[in-house]
Curated annotation (Swiss-Prot):
Positions of short motif Meso-diaminopimelate recognition motif: 421-424
Location in the cell: Cytoplasm
HAMAP family linked: MurE
Metabolic or biological pathway, per its Swiss-Prot or TrEMBL entry: Cell wall biogenesis; peptidoglycan biosynthesis
Maturation and modification: Carboxylation is probably crucial for Mg(2+) binding and, consequently, for the gamma-phosphate positioning of ATP.
UniProt entry tagged with the keyword Cell wall biogenesis/degradation: yes
Disulfide bonding pattern of the chain: none
Protein name: UDP-N-acetylmuramoyl-L-alanyl-D-glutamate--2,6-diaminopimelate ligase
UniProt keyword terms in alphabetical order: ATP-binding, Cell cycle, Cell division, Cell shape, Cell wall biogenesis/degradation, Cytoplasm, Ligase, Magnesium, Nucleotide-binding, Peptidoglycan synthesis
A GO-annotated cellular component: cytoplasm
Highest classification ranks of the organism: Bacteria, Pseudomonadati, Pseudomonadota, Betaproteobacteria, Burkholderiales
Biological process (GO), any one: peptidoglycan biosynthetic process
Cofactor(s) the record lists: Mg(2+)
Species name: Janthinobacterium sp. (strain Marseille) (Minibacterium massiliensis)
């Protein structure tokens, strides 16, 4: 990815200062306010240049736009500047325009197929408990943690926001007092340059499994996109999961290319790599309420008692501890901070239990994530003396090749209910057919219930009180995307309804 020359960047900034002094930048015409500058370039789903007229109607006083393939309309009577490869350079331009707001913050980027959201939220909570108000930007939106808690999050609709919105968000959180930042760095966001213009003090890698092949094409391209984070200029330290093969490759890449970057590895096994610090979790014991493990590190050994369920969350917690220790936080202070962490909304979120089935809502939407989540909940179901249910679907217009893999993985459950996720522009029946093709030897015949609300209600009605029901795939999402519309839908609401219906019907 090319970088603008200093002269070219200065010229653009001078033009903005002359034509739109003190204006805000916006790349979404719907966010334009009177006096703003509209930044227009082709996006994933639409070409921003198609909305120039709309942006001007909403009050844009100037427009900068991608030059290639666009002829300025004489009726658009505002200042305008054509820029080559604008999408690629939007991050650099916006960062410089807003005077690099991230430079005053301790900044950590988190990448990996699964675990980004939990790790970003937990890092924000942990750092804020240690006295550093921390902004978090990711799948749940943009928010700030103080003293371990947070207010509402402003939803952006992306794991990693577009470059212009990202820089505006950084200005806002900086003005609100954030002195640290935890940001989810998606492979697509990295590949598209949404993070261009930022600095990262540290980077955290969680894991690498199949996802987004509809965008990247193959696993090699997907891996290379994620690896871009670890080539970042100025990176000081990398914290890497050694139990993942890509993690080992990243360590080797860093050692050969960027010897000045510090490395901390973490593992649930006995893995070792020369030349790096290693955090290790042993004697892991988990139940419905949380997990206890022994932490071995060069900073000392100690017991850690978390309120989180599952070995994959032990791995994520090790990643958080790795960042804290690399920052210079004392071991016991780091442990105290992670012991206070609780489940992120839509990530192993629990409802019911006791005299009702335990319903667990999780964003697991890849074969690997679903497999690990079911393995964790199998032990919980065994502890409760019950069976395990899996209610899930797959997203439309996204990597159809993973659907039968998801079906195959779901056979780890005793009862499978296949339903919709976000069908988008595909027919739900076709998506479900792809999933069911992978369910070759289920313990019980899978139930096919296309309507997700009905599927959740059905599982809640038929499960025994000691059973565990996993609602997988949508997690925190408050909508279901169908034919271009986002219809209100929250798994937690429908789970609560299913549980209350059991009470009214006197189910056992």
């Amino acid at each position: 990815m090319s970088i603008l020359t200093t002269t070219a960047l200065a010229s653009i900034l001078d033009w903005l200062a002359a034509n739109a002094p003190k204006a805000e930048l916006a790349s979404d015409s719907r966010r334009i306010a009177q006096g703003d500058v509209f930044v227009a370039y082709p996006g994933d789903e639409a070409d921003g240049r198609s909305y120039i007229a709309n942006a001007i109607e909403r009050g844009a006083q100037a427009v900068i736009y991608e030059a290639a393939g666009c002829t300025w309309d004489a009726e658009w009577d505002v200042a305008h500047l054509a820029i080559d490869d604008l999408k690629e350079h939007a991050g650099e331009i916006a960062a410089a325009y807003y005077a690099h707001p991230d430079r005053s913050m301790f900044t950590v980027a988190i990448t990996g197929t699964n675990g980004k959201t939990s790790c970003a939220q937990w890092l924000g909570s942990a750092l804020s408990r240690l006295g550093q108000p921390t902004a978090v930007i990711g799948t749940l939106g943009v928010g700030i943690f103080t003293n371990g808690g947070h207010g509402s999050f402003d939803v952006t609709g992306y794991t990693t926001p577009d470059a212009v919105l990202l820089q505006r968000s950084l200005v806002n959180v900086s003005n609100l007092g954030a002195t640290a930042l935890a940001i989810e760095a998606s492979s697509i966001g990295l590949h598209q340059g949404r993070l261009s213009g930022m600095h990262f003090d540290m980077a955290l890698f969680t894991n690498f499994t199949r996802d987004h092949l509809d965008y990247h094409g193959d696993m090699a391209a997907y891996e290379e996109a994620k690896a871009m984070l670890f080539d970042w200029p100025g990176l000081q330290h990398a914290v890497i999961n050694l139990d993942d093969a890509m993690g080992v490759r990243l360590v080797q890449r860093l050692q050969s290319r960027q010897a000045d970057v510090g490395i901390t590895g973490y593992t649930l096994s006995d893995k070792k790599i020369d030349g790096i610090a290693v955090l290790r979790a042993t004697d892991i014991r988990s139940n419905q309420s949380g997990t206890v493990f022994q932490l071995e590190s060069s900073a000392g050994n100690t017991q850690v008692k978390t309120q989180l369920v599952g070995q994959f969350n032990v791995s994520n917690v090790l990643g958080i501890i790795g960042i804290l220790l690399a920052k210079g936080i004392a071991l016991q202070d780091a442990v105290n901070a992670v012991e206070a962490l609780t489940a992120v909304p839509g990530r192993m979120q629990q409802l019911g239990g006791g005299e009702a089935p335990l319903v667990v809502i999780d964003y697991a939407h890849t074969p690997d994530a679903l497999e690990k989540t079911l393995a964790t909940l199998r032990s919980v179901a065994n502890d409760r003396g019950g069976e395990l249910w899996c209610v899930f679907g797959c997203g439309g217009d996204r990597d159809p090749g993973k659907r039968p893999q998801m079906g195959k993985v779901s056979m780890a459950a005793d009862h499978i209910v296949v339903t919709t996720d976000n069908p988008r522009n595909e027919e739900p029946a076709n998506i479900i057919g792809d999933i069911v093709a992978g369910i070759t030897a289920p313990k019980n015949a899978p139930q096919i219930i296309e309507d997700r609300a009905s599927a959740i209600l059905w599982a809640g009605r038929h499960a025994a009180r000691q059973d565990v029901i996993l609602l997988a795939g949508k997690g925190h999402e408050a909508y279901q995307e169908v034919k271009g519309r986002k219809l209100p839908f929250l798994d937690a609401d429908h789970a609560a309804l299913a549980l209350s219906t059991r009470v009214m019907q006197g189910a056992s």
